[in-house]
Amino acid sequence: MSTLQLKETKVPSVQFVGDDDVLSHILDREGGTKLKKEKAQLLVNPQKVIKKADCELEKSDLEVLEDQNYVKVLGRNIQESLGNGSAKDGRNKVYSFQQRKHPEEMTKLALELAKTSGKKDPLDSNDPEITKNIAQKSKGHSTSEKAPLVNNNKTEFLSTQPHNLRKRIIASRSHYDSESEYSASSSEDDEEATKDEEEDTNVARLSQKSQGQNRLLPAPVSKETLPKKKKRDKASDLVEEYFEAHSSSKVLTSDRTLQRLRRARVDQKTLHNLLRKFVPSFSAEIERLNQQHEKLFHKWMLQLHLGFNIVLYGLGSKRDLLEKFRTTMLQDSIHVVINGYFPGVSVKSILNSITEDVLSHVGTFQSVLDQRDWIINRFKEDSSLELFLLIHNLDSQMLRGDNSQQILGQLSSLHNVYLIASIDHLNAPLMWDHAKQSLYNWLWYETTTYSPYTEETSYENSLLVKQSGSLPLSSLIHVLRSLTPNARGIFRLLMKFQLDNQDSPSYIGLSFQDFYQQCREAFLVNSDLTLRAQLTEFRDHKLIRTKKGTDGVEYLLIPVDSGILADFLEKEEEEA
């Protein structure tokens, strides 16, 4: 009995099952669990689906079909496509993302878009199949891979961008890219931004794709902040480099000067002999150039007699050229040569040479202006008198004064006085205004000689030449002009006292107390401290020298030649 019962239990029972039950049983047994664990939802490639559409459909029909079926196909038949794609084709690998917190947002979005488009919504939010498909779609949302969906050799059409909205989509995308280089929104912010747009689902899908790609980029940074940060970093680097460059306390100025050369300085005569032995490599060219200038001598003589005066300019010393003109053309004429580069030259010395050597006048004049008027009247009275004035360096330091140029211009304006001069300074024409230009009545000649300024620079201070120790007149004038009027008055008192006692053999200088008393009486100082401060400045410029006598008294002395001091006083009186 027990054996029969066991056999009866082992007999299989037969039951009729439908095709749907068989299909669900196969999916549960073979791929159902794997689908839930390993596979994520495959995204739909609208472009590939459209390419597999019926060839008989035209482009315009496809666009109408896409506009009409966009909401209908949203969320439908996703489960079937997943089953086909995962079971049959193993090449489509999709990586799953975390489940969204609000999976029903896509359904609400579809309903709102259907209402705004004015079409009847074919979707029902209460349909469990639609809700399930949309939820699965939100879980498997990805833009990395796209695959076509095939179900029983039937192609399902999904929507693409409508033709009439294509331009607006491109414009919105370009505007979006111009506003921000990177996207800073999360998945929840993307859904909220999609609800705010509510213009077209294609625009929403396009923004979702761009946002999904931008999630792989680094932290969001605004375009406007990047240049500011770069500028700040660059400015900070420049500041650091500046302080690093100036952090060293070492002085980089070199002290290798000519004074460090332990060689005895030569005198002026030895220097002249050395310079004469030097022969330039282009001496033949210089000789030809001088010959061209010498051909103009007769022309210059003609223009001088026509009432013009001649000024020579150009690179190089013109002393030899004027000397050649004097020896060639002025042998039988009365002429006076004036070396303007000489430190002791002045208008007074020029007028003295004319009155004493040319006009043979014996006597003195009250002022330089009286002497000038006497010379002008003498040449006007005797028209047979002719005088040639040759001035080297008319623009020298001693002759460039306004009074000196005015007197020389008045002499050159006489019809029987002929002037030929040379200038070397670049700004020499600035000495003459329109009035002086009309007095001189210049004819300009460019006479470049390329000769060295040997004689012109022989009276200047040099580190190579040993000087006598006394200041030349030009240096004395230059130093005193830089002082205050009180300082010049103090120095003038000491200079007059020294000139008055220059013939005394026992003169050793002016004592400090006597000098202070004279300055106090002239209202130049009010205390001995002020006088000592001024004497310190004179001592720095090497204008005075102090020494103590046998009685311990301090004496003051000017280490300048008496002739230079006398010329300086005359020049001061002329300018006064």
UniProtKB/Swiss-Prot annotation:
Tell me the InterPro entries matching this sequence: ORC2, RecA-like_ORC2, WHD_ORC2
Q: Which GO terms describe its biological process?
A: DNA replication initiation
- Residues annotated as carrying Phosphoserine in the record are 247
UniProt lists compositionally biased (Acidic residues) regions at: 187-201
Localization terms from the record? Nucleus
What GO annotations for molecular function exist for this entry? DNA replication origin binding
Question: Compositional bias (Polar residues) at which positions?
Answer: 150-163, 204-214
Residues of the region (Disordered) are: 112-233
The question of whether Phosphoprotein is a record keyword is answered with: yes
Cite a single Pfam family from the UniProt record: RecA-like_ORC2
The record's keywords, sorted A to Z, are: DNA replication, Nucleus, Phosphoprotein
The UniProt subunit note reads as follows: Component of ORC, a complex composed of at least 6 subunits: ORC1, ORC2, ORC3, ORC4, ORC5 and ORC6. ORC is regulated in a cell-cycle dependent manner. It is sequentially assembled at the exit from anaphase of mitosis and disassembled as cells enter S phase. Interacts with DBF4. Interacts with MCM10. Interacts with LRWD1 throughout the cell cycle; this interaction, which occurs only with non-ubiquitinated form of LRWD1, prevents LRWD1 ubiquitination and hence stabilizes the protein. Interacts with POLQ.
Q: What family does this chain come from, according to its entry?
A: Belongs to the ORC2 family.
Free-text function comment from the UniProt entry: Component of the origin recognition complex (ORC) that binds origins of replication. DNA-binding is ATP-dependent. The specific DNA sequences that define origins of replication have not been identified yet. ORC is required to assemble the pre-replication complex necessary to initiate DNA replication. Binds histone H3 and H4 trimethylation marks H3K9me3, H3K20me3 and H4K27me3. Stabilizes LRWD1, by protecting it from ubiquitin-mediated proteasomal degradation. Also stabilizes ORC3.
- The protein depicted here goes by the name Origin recognition complex subunit 2
The species this protein belongs to is Mus musculus
Give the encoding gene's name: Orc2
